[in-house]
Amino acid sequence: MSLHPDLEAFLDLAQDSQDAGLPAMHQLTPSEARATFEQTTAQLRWPAPQDLEVSEIETLTRDGAALALRLYRPNGIESPLPVLVYFHGGGFVVGSLDSHDGVCREFCQRTPCAVLSVGYRLAPEHRFPTALEDGEDALAWLAEQAASLGLDGSRVAFGGDSAGATLATVLAIQAVRWPHTVAIAPKVQLLCYPVTDASRVHDSRLLFGEGYLLENDTLEWFYQHYARGPEDYLDWRFSPLLAEDLRGVAPAIVLLAGFDPLLDEGQAYVDRLRGQGVEVEVEVCAGLTHDLLRLGAVVPGVLEVYSRVGGALARALEIG
């Protein structure tokens, strides 16, 4: 297995920048890291679909804070529309509706379905489990508003990438284990290179923890900002691989990257789900790294991944 040549050249440039003294994310303050992440997003932007209806929405969390949502709708598709509720990646510390705008546009167009992107609050200002509670509140809003917006509350997927995939799968588990906390039960979960186990270092973190976009030191920096204390690492809502009972959770579409420090824990989660009778469709993008969905400008073949994953989502949501 070898890196995609376009991605290898991109990683070489990133390494040159660090060698020249540009600080790594874990050497920044959270506010500096967020600004850098958004700047990088602008540099990585690709021509994602624009022929969509996009609405900015604001609702309130249970504690009265503003919760930003963004609703994407494909044109020319009859209502009621199935919905992908999407949680962006960024280690619970960085990322935003804007940083993953292109990701949501691709899934909206290529599935096609409505996409509700959730601007959950970030750590360390809002530590675990605030992001999950914001996710619960977003789902409560969707349950109340779906019919009036022409959305089908019976055909909903929970999805996300990296830390966002963690939120998506934990909410999918809660829908079965703690149904009183989740207003809508998903038909399927879309988990793109998820964080599933902060409690230990898996082998892929040793193999790919330096020089492959996501660094081990950055991972630990994320966890330390998100957790209230070390005991949170053992909470299944922080590390869903540690969940005792996964029986009955929604079928999963799982996307992994071959050069990702999170590869092994992602595969371990696939194995756990299958071992407890959950249907799982998995794709490993062999020559790619973590955050591959935002690399369409670097590796054009990433857009084909969206088509394959969108097709799987369409089947699961009974589209077409």
Regions found by a protein language model. Give the residues of each.
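Alpha/beta hydrolase fold serine-hydrolase catalytic domain that processes acyl esters and thioesters
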Residues: T169-G320
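Short beta-strand element of the alpha/beta-hydrolase
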Residues: P80-G89
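Short beta-strand-to-loop junctions in surface cap/lid or active-site-entrance loops
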Residues: L69-P80, L241-L246
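A glycine/proline-hinged amphipathic helix-loop "lid/cap" segment
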Residues: M1-L71, E318-G320
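Short amphipathic alpha-helix adjacent to the substrate-entry channel of hydrolases
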Residues: D98-S117
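Alpha/beta-hydrolase active-site loop
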Residues: H126-S148, V309
